[in-house]
């Protein structure tokens, strides 16, 4: 956020105490011991007999030997996690979600930590065969007990806008007007527990002229480049995986929006440790991902909004640390709870303070409230969110929400008294209505609020993804990594579609209110823009497969009312997004 004001009579922030330092270290050690504990139980479980000791009965760790259990069916075996389903292959991800709601795959994966992974027995071919029996994919080059080499599907993605930039969840594409395309593909190699996926992407962007304002938009040069894309190197350690990756990620239950991690921006190099399967315990099952990496900016490209432009030239690297934990209670079979927390700060400041390793490099383990550390004096940004997803098997439906804060609370009193400050949310509902075994109707609705609330009249928080401590905001290569509808925007989406295997025909309506609150010239006395920019989008969505070609297309007509907040400036924008997957 750009302006921070303490609540009236808010006590001054306390200096960091030695006890506070030990709290962060304690949290980190506890987490590491937890990982070692269930890893030990996994290894020892392989040598135990059928009889359980008192320890097994009390703790009853049942680490899933089948990492892709959520894709299980009565006649399919699940081995170790391997090839990824890239975030961006939204059609395959959507169909996996539909199969889970329909009860055709097990509900023990929250689907809130992606990318998802196939494996040696459930290959792309078998997964696609579950989706549609007519789809074939023969991608294996070498298949031996300890060696697997496979070709990855080739995807050719195209995007076109006719008036101004529009669209989201498009990875390496730039925020520009005109025609863009991306080609991706590669090879996957598995040797024992080592898994290497090389999936580079070639992208060519556009540079069409369009009407901008001093506040929104920027016409920037086009570029063409080869990027690492959806590549990774992974090594399995029982139920854990350590990895280096440039893959896009998606955290949270949303279909169109994720508050903290989506493929709205290009992926970035990160190092992670994560569970490679749902981990069953006496209290329920857990999944997690802990990661760290560096975010980048591109001096040749613009930002969506002037509030994200670096106001000060800063050549320091931005260090990024985040964690996502998903929990499915033992007593609530179809309910999933999630917690996500992220930090970013400049590396040149890490060595200039004496707060210790945990505070500087794994701050996701420090206390949640800011009165433990003097965060407002440190150039860094933290964001946190909680989520829930509830599957209704009999209704073949689900409800979900994500609620978060763009700024950490001062203390528990601050949390209780000013819940709306810096808050945002995503919530949605999805329902399937089956016509027969393979044909069904899909209904889904999703709403997101990322503009700050009217509480800013008392205590300005700025919109989501901006912060005075990190001048580039929550971005990578100048694009927001979280919510997709735009900076400070509110969004509602409604979709209805007919499905038959892979094939799909549907309609989507989206309503976007562009940054309705802001402290800029021209607003009225209560801080609400006198002229509101609103987009109304009407679209056709379709999927079709022919032999080894999987085609999906999204075509929308967007009517912008008061574009760039200019009265009676109402252009029409056409948007086309076509993704073609070539199988082997």
Q: Model-predicted segments: where are they?
A:
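Primarily recognizes Gram-negative and organellar outer-membrane beta-barrels
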Residues: 143-177, 204-227, 262-264, 279-285, ...
């Amino acid at each position: 956020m750009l302006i921070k004001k303490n609540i009236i009579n808010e006590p001054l922030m306390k200096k960091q105490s030695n006890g506070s330092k030990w709290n962060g270290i304690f949290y980190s050690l506890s987490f590491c011991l937890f990982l070692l504990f269930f890893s030990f139980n996994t290894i020892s479980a392989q040598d135990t007999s059928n009889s359980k000791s008192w320890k097994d009965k009390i703790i009853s760790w049942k680490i899933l030997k089948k990492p892709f259990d959520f894709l299980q069916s009565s006649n399919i075996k699940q081995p170790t996690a391997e090839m990824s389903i890239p975030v961006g292959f939204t059609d395959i991800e959507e169909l996996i979600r539909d199969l889970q709601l329909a009860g055709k795959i097990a509900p023990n994966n929250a689907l809130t930590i992606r990318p998802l992974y196939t494996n040696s027995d459930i290959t792309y071919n078998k997964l696609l065969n579950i989706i549609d029996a007519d789809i074939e994919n023969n991608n294996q080059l070498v298949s031996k007990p300890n060696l697997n080499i496979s070709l990855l599907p080739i995807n050719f993605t195209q995007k076109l806008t006719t008036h101004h930039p529009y669209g989201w969840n498009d990875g390496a594409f730039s925020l520009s007007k005109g025609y863009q395309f991306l080609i991706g593909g590669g090879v996957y190699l598995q040797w024992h527990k080592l898994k290497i996926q090389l999936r580079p992407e070639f992208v060519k962007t556009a540079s069409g002229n369009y009407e901008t304002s001093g506040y929104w938009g920027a016409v920037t040069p086009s570029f063409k480049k080869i990027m690492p894309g959806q590549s990774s190197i992974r090594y399995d350690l029982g139920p854990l995986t350590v990895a280096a990756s440039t893959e896009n990620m998606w955290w949270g239950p949303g279909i169109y929006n994720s508050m903290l991690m989506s493929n709205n921006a290009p992926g970035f190099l990160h190092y992670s440790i994560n569970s490679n399967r749902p981990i069953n315990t006496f209290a329920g099952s857990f999944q997690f991902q802990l990661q760290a990496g560096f975010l980048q900016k591109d001096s040749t490209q613009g930002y969506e909004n002037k509030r994200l432009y670096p106001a000060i030239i800063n050549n320091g690297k931005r260090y990024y640390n985040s964690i996502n934990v998903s929990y499915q209670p033992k007593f609530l079979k179809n309910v999933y709870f999630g917690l996500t927390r992220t930090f970013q700060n400049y590396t040149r400041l890490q060595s200039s303070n004496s707060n210790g390793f945990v505070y500087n490099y794994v701050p996701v383990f420090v206390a949640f409230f800011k009165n433990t550390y003097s965060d407002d004096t440190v150039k860094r940004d933290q964001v946190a969110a909680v989520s829930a997803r509830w599957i209704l098997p009999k209704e073949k439906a689900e409800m979900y929400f994500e609620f978060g804060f763009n700024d950490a609370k001062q203390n528990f009193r601050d949390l209780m008294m000013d819940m709306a400050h810096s808050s945002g949310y995503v919530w949605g509902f999805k329902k399937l209505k089956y016509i027969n075994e393979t044909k069904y109707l899909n209904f889904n609705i999703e709403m997101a609020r990322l503009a700050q609330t009217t509480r800013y009249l008392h205590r300005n928080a700025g919109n989501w993804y901006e912060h005075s401590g990190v001048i580039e905001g929550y971005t990578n290569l100048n694009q927001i990594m979280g919510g997709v509808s735009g900076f400070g925007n509110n969004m509602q989406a409604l979709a209805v579609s007919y499905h038959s295997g892979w094939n799909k025909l549907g309609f989507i309506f989206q309503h976007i209110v562009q940054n309705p609150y802001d402290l800029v010239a021209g607003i009225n006395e209560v801080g609400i823009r006198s002229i509101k920019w609103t987009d109304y989008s009407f679209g056709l969505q379709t999927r079709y497969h022919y032999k080894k070609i999987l085609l999906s297309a999204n075509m929308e007509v967007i009517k912008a009312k008061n574009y760039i907040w200019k009265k009676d400036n109402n252009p029409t924008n056409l948007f086309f997004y076509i993704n073609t997957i070539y199988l082997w």
